[in-house]
Swiss-Prot record:
Lysosomal thiol reductase that can reduce protein disulfide bonds. May facilitate the complete unfolding of proteins destined for lysosomal degradation. Plays an important role in antigen processing. Facilitates the generation of MHC class II-restricted epitodes from disulfide bond-containing antigen by the endocytic reduction of disulfide bonds. Also facilitates MHC class I-restricted recognition of exogenous antigens containing disulfide bonds by CD8+ T-cells or crosspresentation. The keyword Amino-acid biosynthesis does not apply. Glycans are attached at residues 60, 92, 105. Dimer; disulfide-linked. The lineage of its organism: Eukaryota, Metazoa, Chordata, Craniata, Vertebrata. The keyword Secreted applies. It comes from Rattus norvegicus (Rat). One of its GO terms (cellular component) is cytosol. One of its GO terms (biological process) is antigen processing and presentation of exogenous peptide antigen via MHC class I. This is Gamma-interferon-inducible lysosomal thiol reductase.
Length: 248
């Protein structure tokens, strides 16, 4: 994929900093959460506070992918991320960076061969370590930030600085190049190999454990499958969307 500069990503990122973000694009605080309100100051990025209690379980969206796959990067940045912005309060995202890689046990050590070469294996481990070491939403946003960039490895530091400045890129790279990175990749290999039905390609997307054949339908699928009494506003507007054809 020919990736664009930071500008397109920033157009989406600006949504996170708007003083009055639409309800469908925010993490709502439960009533009486004075502690969260006190600690979340006006200049902070307050996406990681407690959310309101849901009247039904969130919709589970799982993405099985590999870090340098063009189609995976497109789905992550252009489909999954915008959907999360709009309906984050009713969806739960799981990322599994491994994809079409292969593993083998060599003298008791797991070695990996990745579809797009050694760099992809390294970046898969980096993203696995982000998911292992950071809070879930911070890891997701950092990975989206990296996947938007041309040189993902060099952008690890700036993306961490944007969302979790207290975490150093050196600590993530230490994980990725060490024993923990190998363990995480092996775990992701097992998760990927256990898929039923097996994945046919990447990105392989599951919505409530069922494959999503049309990535463009992610938002509508999440809205449809959520069984709660209150849905984000965007779900109501989608229900009133015009037909694709006009009958005579």
């Amino acid at each position: 994929m020919s990736c664009s500069p930071l500008v397109p990503f920033l157009s989406l990122l600006l949504l996170l900093f708007l003083p009055e973000v639409p309800r469908a694009a925010t993490a709502s605080l439960p009533q009486g959460s004075s502690e969260g309100a006190a600690t979340c100051k006006a200049h902070d990025l307050c996406l990681f506070g407690p959310r309101r209690l849901l009247s039904a379980p969130p919709v589970n969206v799982s993405l099985y992918y590999e870090s340098l796959c063009g189609a995976c990067r497109y789905f992550l940045v252009r489909n999954l991320f915008p959907t999360w912005l709009m309906v984050m309060e009713i969806m739960n995202i799981t990322l599994v960076p491994y994809g079409n890689a292969q593993e083998r046990n060599v003298s008791g050590t797991w070695e990996f061969t990745c579809q797009h070469g050694e760099l992809e294996c390294k970046l898969n481990k980096v993203e696995a370590c982000l998911l292992d070491k950071l809070e879930k939403e911070a890891a997701f946003l950092t990975i989206v930030c990296m996947e938007e960039m041309e040189d993902m490895e060099k952008k690890l530091g700036p993306c961490l600085q944007l969302y979790v400045p207290e975490v150093s890129p050196e600590s993530i790279m230490e994980c990725a190049t060490g024993k923990r990175g190998t363990e995480l990749m092996h775990e992701n290999a097992q998760l990927t190999d256990a898929l039923q039905p097996p994945h046919e390609y990447v990105p392989w997307v599951l919505v409530n454990e069922k494959p999503l054949t049309d990535p463009s339908q992610l938002l509508s699928s999440v809205c449809e499958l959520y069984q709660g009494t209150e849905k984000p506003d965007i779900c109501s507007s989608m229900a009133d969307a015009p037909r694709e054809v006009c009958y005579k």
